[in-house]
Curated annotation (Swiss-Prot):
It comes from Xenopus laevis (African clawed frog). Keywords: Activator, Coiled coil, Nucleus, Transcription, Transcription regulation. Component of the Mediator complex, a coactivator involved in the regulated transcription of nearly all RNA polymerase II-dependent genes. Mediator functions as a bridge to convey information from gene-specific regulatory proteins to the basal RNA polymerase II transcription machinery. Mediator is recruited to promoters by direct interactions with regulatory proteins and serves as a scaffold for the assembly of a functional preinitiation complex with RNA polymerase II and the general transcription factors. GO terms for biological process: regulation of transcription by RNA polymerase II. Residues 12-31 have a biased composition (Acidic residues). This is Mediator of RNA polymerase II transcription subunit 9. Residues 31-107 form a coiled coil. Component of the Mediator complex. GO terms for molecular function: transcription coregulator activity. The keyword Nucleus applies. Belongs to the Mediator complex subunit 9 family. It comes from the Eukaryota. The gene is med9.
Amino acid sequence: MATGGTVRPAEEPEEEEEEEDEAVEEEEEEDYTFLPLVHDIIKCMDKDSQDVYQELNELKSKFQAMRKLVGNMPGIDMSPEEQQRHLQSLREQVQTKSELLQKYKSLCMFEIPKE
């Protein structure tokens, strides 16, 4: 199957995906950190710079974005006790489904075709 392009080993795409995932994670971590902004504000204050107001506005908008993000999280409207009950219910469902899956596997109703 010649496509005119170079053939890469099968491992390369996975490595590229891992690198992309790490880059996205780093980007997301930066979105949730406030320390660099606070540091910039302190530096501006030390220099008596007029950029302090801009930095403060950036910090304020970041806090607002985080409040919105937290407000939209699933389960935020439930108490910790309700969350624990819900978690326990989900664990029981997983346990039941795992047991059923093992039961169905042991029935040997599914034949694996021989090639």
